[in-house]
């Protein structure tokens, strides 16, 4: 891994020089999920510290429409564009519009070169044989650039991105390197703990609105309160001590033996939101609610944004539990699917995935947007959701992402045809 890092550092050095030698303003475009917002936070802090004028925008997709708008900006202002958590899949459009650009992405690249032309540098782990779906996130890629400036403290936001993109169990490759570097500089402390201690709210609320793990029988405040009372734990405690932890673990495992992930490695970071899991959930909630500026503000440790983020998180968690209770899973040969609400289908799919991939979709105007989720067991059996969802092109849409998590967009009248085709492809993958 260190040999690969040395090769990557040749590119990060070139990116640093490109940023320092640009005297106009910088245009940052990043994604709206946790990893994208963490990436935006890293880049914002880095550019503020280097006294660079910049304008940051968060988008759901780097669509042709978004690129066309940026092209008009480019004609007038000639900024340096930095694309984070996107760009490698849209590089032909970026080249076509003659952008002066830096691409910091971890999705499979269309062009497997770092130096695309005299104007475009691409830092993508896949070019160096590093798996962007398991070994590093977009925020990790952004951190490798910030690290070139000596900003090692920004590793904490990369850790949040690792959690947001579900790359923490286990930590592999450059993810492990980033976490170890953060530990070395004392920006993170890792401790094994019960998952409910993350939230610092009354423990009955933590249990009622927890989705990892999701225990349907306890997914209401009243039921969680009674369960704790019955086993002799004060439901209003905000942190469980070792005695109460053992008591709760024993009770849950006895009653719900299939439940996993009750004990986790918590990442206590140097940030006003101390727990990286909590910060990751907060960014996901504000991102899914379209409060992108709040998300970046949380990364920048703005007190008002953190306060708003905490309120939005608990509203989101309550809505999520209600949505989970109402979801009606339908089954094809190789997938489960459901129709859900905007901003929730991805997280619901990831909660419900077990023996088959789960695909959620919602209708927005004339189009249907899909989020597909698998797990590592399915990927090890051959699942590649990025390939499966890319079949959207056959239906006049587009799709892609990672092997374990991916998305697609097609017209709403093609939903059933698309799902049937995806089911066939996934069946072929899992039979290999």
Curated annotation (Swiss-Prot):
BP GO terms, sorted: DNA recombination
Pfam families noted in UniProt: DHHA1
Annotated transmembrane regions: none
A GO molecular-function descriptor: nucleic acid binding
Coiled-coil spans in chain: none
Domain of life, per lineage: Archaea
Family as reported in the entry's similarity comment: To M.jannaschii MJ0977.
PANTHER family noted in UniProt: SINGLE-STRANDED-DNA-SPECIFIC EXONUCLEASE RECJ (PTHR30255:SF2)
This protein's name: Uncharacterized protein MJ0831
Source organism of this protein record: Methanocaldococcus jannaschii (strain ATCC 43067 / DSM 2661 / JAL-1 / JCM 10045 / NBRC 100440)
């Amino acid at each position: 891994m260190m040999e690969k890092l040395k090769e990557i550092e040749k590119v990060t050095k070139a990116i640093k020089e490109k940023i320092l030698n640009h005297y106009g303003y910088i245009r940052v475009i990043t994604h709206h999920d946790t990893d994208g917002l963490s990436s935006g936070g890293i880049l914002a802090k880095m550019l503020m510290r280097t006294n660079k004028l910049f304008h940051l925008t968060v988008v759901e997709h780097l669509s042709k429409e978004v690129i066309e708008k940026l092209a008009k900006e480019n004609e007038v202002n000639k900024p340096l564009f930095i694309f984070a958590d996107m760009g490698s899949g849209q590089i032909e459009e970026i080249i076509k519009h003659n952008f002066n650009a830096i691409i910091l992405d971890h999705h499979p690249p269309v062009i497997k070169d770092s130096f695309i032309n005299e104007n475009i540098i691409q830092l993508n782990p896949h070019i160096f044989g590093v798996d962007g779906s398991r070994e590093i996130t977009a925020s990790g890629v952004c951190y490798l650039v910030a690290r070139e400036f000596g900003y090692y403290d920004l590793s904490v936001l990369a850790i949040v991105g690792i959690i947001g993109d579900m790359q923490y169990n286990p930590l592999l490759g450059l993810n492990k390197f980033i976490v170890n570097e953060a530990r070395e500089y004392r920006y993170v402390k890792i401790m094994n703990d019960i998952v409910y201690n993350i939230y610092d709210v009354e423990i009955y609320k933590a249990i009622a609105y927890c989705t990892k793990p999701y225990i349907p029988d306890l997914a209401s405040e009243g039921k969680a309160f009674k369960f704790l009372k019955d086993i002799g734990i004060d439901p209003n405690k905000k942190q469980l001590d070792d005695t109460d932890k053992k008591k709760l673990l024993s009770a849950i495992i006895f009653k719900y033996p299939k439940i996993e992930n009750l004990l986790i490695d918590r990442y206590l970071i140097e940030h006003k939101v101390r727990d990286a899991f909590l910060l990751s959930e907060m960014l996901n909630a504000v991102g899914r609610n379209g409060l992108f500026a709040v998300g970046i503000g949380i990364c920048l440790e703005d007190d008002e944004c953190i306060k708003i983020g905490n309120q939005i998180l608990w509203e989101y968690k309550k809505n999520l539990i209600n949505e989970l209770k109402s979801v009606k899973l339908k089954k094809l040969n190789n997938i489960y699917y459901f129709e859900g609400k905007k901003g929730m289908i991805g997280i619901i799919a990831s909660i419900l995935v077990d023996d088959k991939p789960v695909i959620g979709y919602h209708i927005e105007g004339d189009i249907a947007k899909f989020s597909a989720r698998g797990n590592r067991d399915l990927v090890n059996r051959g699942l590649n959701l990025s390939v499966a969802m890319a079949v959207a092109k056959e239906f006049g849409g587009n799709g892609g992402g990672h092997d374990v998590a991916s998305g697609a967009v097609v017209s709403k009248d093609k939903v059933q045809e698309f799902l049937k085709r995806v089911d066939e492809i996934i069946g072929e993958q899992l039979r290999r």
